[in-house]
Structure formats: C-alpha cells, structure tokens
C-alpha cells in the first residue's frame, strides 16, 4: 500500500472523528418520517461537501476516487459507525450508473447535479407478478405524441414515499418477446396519475411501497437508451448493486454489526462460553472471507460470470445468521425493543427487528434461490433448469 493511500486513510479518519455525529443512533431511534428525511439529506450534504458522497462517479461529476481510495473510505466510515445513505442509495448508485452508461448528455446534466443536491430516486422494476422473473412485467407505456402514457403497478419500491424521481421499466411493445419489448424511462414522481401506498413491514417500518400508475404521462425525452431496449439498460442498474456497494455493506457488517454482537454477548454474560466463542469466531472468519471476496471483485481480481452472485448470496445469508444469533443471545429483552435507528441498515443492535429485516436481503436484487441457480449454471457449468421448473 502506498504512502498516498496511508495519508488518505489518516485524512478520512480525522474527518470521521470530527464529523460523524456521536449520538446519531439514539437521535434516529423512533423519529418521524420528516425527521428521518432531514437527517439523511443533512448527512448526504456533509459527505458531499467533503467529497465523500459519490467517490465512484467520474471526476467531472464530483467523484474520481481510485478503487483503493474507495475501499479506504468505506472501511473507515464503517469503522467509525457512520450513518448509511439509505435514501440517497438509488440515486447515487442505480440512477447514476444508468445515466452515465446509457443516458443522454442532457439527461446527465439535468439529473446528476440534482442528485448531488439531494434529489431522491426510487427503482420501479418489480411488480406483483414480476419479481424474480422481472421480464414478465405488465406495466405498459404507450406512445402518444411527445409522451409515453404509462399504466400499471410497481411493488417493493424502496423509499418510494420520499422519492422525487423513478427509474421505470415498462412494456412498450406488447407483441415482442419478454425481454425485447421493454423500455427504460425516467418518471417524475410528482406527475399526475401516480399513487404511492406504503407497505407496512413486520418491523413496523414502511421502507417499501406500492406505486400505482394511471395514465401517467412521461416525456419521450425521458427515455433512456433505445425504445424496446430497456432490458439491456437495466443491467447497468442491477449491476450497481454489486461490487463497491457490497463492499460497503460487508465493512459495515464487520464493524458495527459484529461489534454489536460481541457487546450483546458480553451484556448477556456468555462471552466466555465455548459455544458462543466458537460462533463468534466463525462469524469473524466468514466476515473476513466476505471482505476478501468483495475486494477481489472491486479490484478486478475476480471476474467470473457468477462472482457477483456469490458475494450477494454470501452477504445476505451471513447477515441473516448473524442477526438470528443476536436475537437468540438477547433473549426476551431483545423482543421488547420496538424501535431502532432507521439510518443504520440491518446492523443496529435491535436484534429481533434486525433479524426480521435481514430476510429482505435474501429476496431483493435476486432471491437466494435465484443466486444459487446462477452460481450453479454460470459459475459451475451445471445443466440449466428446465423451462417452468
């Protein structure tokens, strides 16, 4: 590792010591939606002012960090228990990667600066009958002059209650094969005809929403990529969930998540018990392995056709086991915690709520069963599952 990287690490550590709110977890427990949005936007602005909000973007748009610098940044933010950018996530990762890869210059100039100013995005992909089989989506976009007229329903839209814009997949050619008649649109969430309904989760939160679209007019200028080629464009969006974003999550799990678990075992007075010590050691080994897989992926040492699926499966299953163990250790007391810091992700130390929430990670972005199929077919060369299996 070079001296420059070590200097950068020292700079990030100093910044974290000065800027990460020391009491943010307590302050973010049980807050209202408005308070949550204000805090998320304020923290994003703090990171942006210091050049830490979008390190993966090109330099001309406010990023330009090397892979090594990004690894250091995410590692130090996790080590200092910084809040997660939950509401900004889709914008800075999914929307940005799509616009940079397939958007027009006008679309980039309109939306990338707005994202840096706090514009919130939601992903409008999944539908009630099109989750794992996303290409089966039924939402339609009919061309009408200079607009597309959109009708349909989206579900599991993360952050939809607060979103300004939506990355929308809709069927523009009903006669084409499933993946060949889909277009990719940028939809203003303030457009007439949009209804957003929160989905109440078992944790008590409403992070996900249903979005109903009734004759919503989307300007044709908001089409990303060629008409009917949205499936190919969407691969850029889905690809943004891998690599560096998974490294950030792995670092957070290895810092805040594991630290909270050790502290829980200490509070329960079981830290010295051999069974508990063995489980903690196993978790630490797995977290170390996950970090290594993520770093191999982002540094280009791993480029197999199923490597991203391996990382996603490994992380989500490990998160679920770790939070399950935390819930067991916390006992009855863990079931009485009814609120958690909502800017923390799924490693808050509210173990029962974290465990319930962890199940979401084994479904979105490709369920664990889908990831295993990809690993088997693309990674190991096993026979493909028969159609309809």
Task: Provide a role label for each language-model segment.
Residues 1-89, 110, 114, 259, ...:
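Amphipathic, small/basic residue-rich leader segments at the start of a protein or domain
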Residues 3, 194-291, 361:
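Glycine-rich beta->alpha junctions and the first turn(s) of the following alpha-helix
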Residues 41-118, 159-165, 287, 294, ...:
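Internal helix-loop-helix
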Residues 68, 72-73, 94, 231-241, ...:
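Glycine-rich phosphate/cofactor-binding loops in nucleotide/flavin-utilizing enzymes
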Residues 117-125, 169:
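A short, Trp-centered hydrophobic/proline-enriched beta-strand micro-motif
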Residues 130, 155-160, 202-203, 360-367:
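Glycine-rich phosphate/pyrophosphate-binding beta-alpha loops
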Residues 139-142:
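A structural signal for short hydrophobic beta-strand segments in well-ordered beta-sheet cores
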Residues 147, 151-197:
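A short core secondary-structure module
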């Amino acid at each position: 590792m070079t001296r420059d990287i070590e200097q950068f690490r020292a700079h990030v550590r100093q910044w974290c010591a000065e800027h990460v709110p020391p009491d943010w977890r307590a302050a973010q427990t049980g807050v209202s939606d408005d308070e949550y949005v204000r805090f998320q936007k304020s923290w994003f602005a703090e990171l942006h002012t210091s050049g830490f909000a979008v390190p993966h973007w090109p330099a001309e748009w406010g990023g330009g960090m090397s892979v090594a610098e990004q690894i250091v940044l995410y590692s130090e933010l996790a080590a200092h228990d910084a809040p997660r950018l939950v509401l900004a996530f889709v914008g800075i990762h999914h929307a940005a990667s799509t616009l940079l890869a397939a958007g027009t210059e006008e679309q980039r100039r309109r939306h990338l600066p707005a994202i840096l100013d706090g514009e919130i995005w939601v992903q409008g992909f999944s539908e009630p009958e099109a989750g794992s089989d996303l290409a089966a989506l039924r939402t339609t976009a009919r061309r009408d002059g200079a607009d597309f007229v959109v009708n349909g329903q989206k579900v599991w839209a993360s952050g939809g209650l607060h979103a300004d814009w939506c990355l929308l997949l809709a069927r523009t050619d009903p006669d084409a094969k499933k993946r060949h008649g889909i277009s990719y649109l940028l939809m203003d969430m303030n457009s007439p005809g949009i209804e957003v309904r929160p989905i109440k989760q078992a944790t008590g939160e409403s992070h996900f929403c249903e979005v109903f679209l009734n004759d919503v007019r989307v300007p044709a200028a908001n089409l990303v990529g060629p008409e009917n080629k949205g499936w190919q464009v969407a691969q850029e969006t889905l690809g943004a969930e891998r690599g560096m974003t998974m490294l950030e999550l792995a670092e957070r799990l290895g810092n805040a998540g594991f630290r909270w678990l050790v502290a829980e075992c200490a509070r329960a007075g079981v830290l010295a018990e051999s069974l508990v010590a063995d489980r903690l050691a196993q978790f630490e080994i797995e977290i170390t392995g996950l970090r290594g897989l993520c770093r191999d992926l982002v540094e280009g040492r791993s480029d197999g056709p199923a490597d991203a699926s391996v990382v996603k499966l490994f992380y989500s299953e490990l998160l679920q086991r770790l939070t399950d163990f935390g819930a067991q250790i916390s006992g009855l007391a863990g079931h009485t915690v009814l609120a958690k810091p909502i800017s923390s992700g799924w490693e808050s130390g509210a173990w029962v709520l974290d465990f319930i929430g962890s199940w979401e990670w084994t479904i979105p972005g490709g369920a664990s069963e889908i990831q295993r199929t990809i690993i088997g077919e693309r990674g190991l060369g096993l026979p493909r599952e028969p159609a309809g299996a």
